[in-house]
Amino acid sequence: MMLLPIVLSACAASDEGKSITFTDDRGVASQPFPRNYRTEVLSFLKTYLNNPVGVRDAVIAEPVERVIGGRQRYVVCLRFSARESDGGYREPRERAMLFVDGRLDRILENAAEPCTGLAYAPFAELEKLTR
């Protein structure tokens, strides 16, 4: 019984730092364009944000291909200010949404590098979100 945790930890440690992915990883090969990126971003943020109502100053950039963690990914950058639990607002923050195989994979809270030099346009749909 005492050996079970040791055996399981050995299995977990034997991947040599490889990340777990459930998609077909093309590495540095080109990815398909995320055609429904706006809809996917809105659906994700509706569940991700503590309060999706009352978002301000929302802007979004068109998807661009970037190398993230040694892998080619489409990145959609956005900047917005979400309503806090006390009803106030912080300064708008930039976030990056990563797409794999044309589908939303994850969000990067620290988006300074992947979002450098992008042109933003208003994202009114995000400001109109409801619960």
What are these language model-derived features?
Residues 12-131:
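Cystatin/cathelin-like cysteine-protease inhibitor module
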